Amino acid sequence: MALLERIKHHEGFRSKVYRCTENELTIGYGFAIKDLELDEDIAEMILMRKLDNLMNRIQKTFHWWRSAEDEVKNVVVEMCYQLG
């Protein structure tokens, strides 16, 4: 088994933040959050994915979504994003 696969196998993947055995906030394949840094490209990629997910949820919730004008959609998405 290649090194990458071994580490992935033994660490396991978690998509949500959790506390590791050392009580550190951790995510992914054992990445301690306190040690993480994001460059702008990665942050933008994450933002785009979050916006896609958010727009899908909004579309399922509001029947008028498909017929709304783009500016209305943009305001609704931004408001939902800002409110969390």
Tell me what each language-model feature is.
Residues M1-L83:
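Acidic, aromatic-lined catalytic clefts of primarily extracellular/periplasmic carbohydrate-active enzymes
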